[in-house]
Amino acid sequence: MKFKLKTTSGAARRGELTFNRPQGEFSVQTPAFMPVGTYGTVKGMTPEEVRATGAEILLGNTFHLWLRPGQEVMRKHGDLHDFMQWHRPILTDSGGFQVFSLGKLRKITEEGVKFQNPINGERIFLSPEKSMEIQYDLGSDIVMIFDECTPYPATFDYAKKSMEMSLRWAKRSRDRFDELGNKNALFGIVQGGTFEELRKVSAENLINIGFDGYAVGGLAVGEPKEEMHRILEFTTPLLPADKPRYLMGVGKPEDLVEGVRRGIDMFDCVMPTRNARNGHLFVTDGIVKIRNAKYKDDTSPLDPHCDCYTCQHYTKSYLYHLDKCGEILGARLNTIHNLRYYQRLMEQIRTAIEQDRFDDFVQEFYARMDKPVPPLQKA
């Protein structure tokens, strides 16, 4: 993987990731949004449909794919790209977040995490080394280190111990990744909770270990938006300017805009797909809750500014009808729209950065939503 920083507008960055895959060279324009394909599928969508929304890279979930179908099945197909028939780049998370979200079902030790398999109840163990091995079998183009996602709220002492263990795990991840002869990219993950001092230590140590890109982890876990913005604004300038920066698990459209304002290049979130299945649809000036009875007779398209298949062919009334009847097509059409909305947003962001008018774009974005622009700490 190579990263080229093309231009900036304030702290916002316009770049390009390039990947050499067996099928040829693929580029990912940044800032980029990655749809989430937890079980080797973006729910309800074929790879061709996902690509048609503008997606250039997907996220796969190491933890869930390890439990089902498992490494052996993956190896029989070749890798995750062959298994799901998406031959463009894939980033996989390390499984850490899913393990830590199991709560009482897991026990953290220096070696790794022992936990109860949520599918069949058996006791299993996931370590930094094992995570690297699973992601190697998945053929991930971007591999994430195994870390502990520090919960919120956390005391300074807990956040410090957690961050220090994540650094030790980062080194073990790096070592096993190299031992496997993996030629793909490995990203480090900055932890440290809401404490700037800990974030600084984490970033400096990860840079010393050396990674192909750096993620900001442990955010969007319940902390107030102001806290997330503060930590993001503090952390991103600590990271190498010539490496991609990834904000994990975030988020709402305004979160993407705020991340880009603070120098982030990559995002992922289940929000566009999950919200689509629940009838919450993102449009130019906010959200349409398609289950609302006022749409029963509405013959207008979902968003007149959107070029997606759904908006070009169907009315709000039809989408309301499909949802009311529990038709699978409704969830699919909603998903197509929401994913396209996110990709259009990223396209607009990239254009604004290229034209060095990103600040104007931010003002226009919030004006359409009828919301105030969140302040920058250093403004």
Curated annotation (Swiss-Prot):
InterPro entries: ArchSynthase1/Queuine_TRR, TGT, TGT-like_sf, tRNA_ribo_trans-like
Free-text comment on the cofactor: Binds 1 zinc ion per subunit.
A Gene Ontology biological process term: tRNA-guanine transglycosylation
Top-level EC class as recorded in UniProt: transferase
GO cellular component terms, A-Z: cytosol
KW DNA-binding (keyword) present: no
GO molecular function, one term: tRNA-guanosine(34) queuine transglycosylase activity
Catalytic activity from the UniProt record: 7-aminomethyl-7-carbaguanine + guanosine(34) in tRNA = 7-aminomethyl-7-carbaguanosine(34) in tRNA + guanine
Cofactor(s) this protein cannot do without: Zn(2+)
Enzyme Commission number: 2.4.2.29
Keyword terms of this UniProt record: Glycosyltransferase, Metal-binding, Queuosine biosynthesis, Transferase, tRNA processing, Zinc
Gene3D superfamilies the record matches: Queuine tRNA-ribosyltransferase-like
Pathway stated in the Swiss-Prot or TrEMBL entry: tRNA modification; tRNA-queuosine biosynthesis
Binding site for substrate: 93-97, 147, 191, 218
Coiled-coil region list: none
Location of region: RNA binding: 249-255, 273-277
Active site positions, chain numbering: 93 (proton acceptor), 268 (nucleophile)
Record function comment: Catalyzes the base-exchange of a guanine (G) residue with the queuine precursor 7-aminomethyl-7-deazaguanine (PreQ1) at position 34 (anticodon wobble position) in tRNAs with GU(N) anticodons (tRNA-Asp, -Asn, -His and -Tyr). Catalysis occurs through a double-displacement mechanism. The nucleophile active site attacks the C1' of nucleotide 34 to detach the guanine base from the RNA, forming a covalent enzyme-RNA intermediate. The proton acceptor active site deprotonates the incoming PreQ1, allowing a nucleophilic attack on the C1' of the ribose to form the product.
Assigned protein family: Belongs to the queuine tRNA-ribosyltransferase family.
Quaternary structure annotation from Swiss-Prot or TrEMBL: Homodimer. Within each dimer, one monomer is responsible for RNA recognition and catalysis, while the other monomer binds to the replacement base PreQ1.
Stored HAMAP family: Q_tRNA_Tgt
Descriptive protein name: Queuine tRNA-ribosyltransferase
Species name: Mannheimia succiniciproducens (strain KCTC 0769BP / MBEL55E)
Classification of source organism: Bacteria, Pseudomonadati, Pseudomonadota, Gammaproteobacteria, Pasteurellales
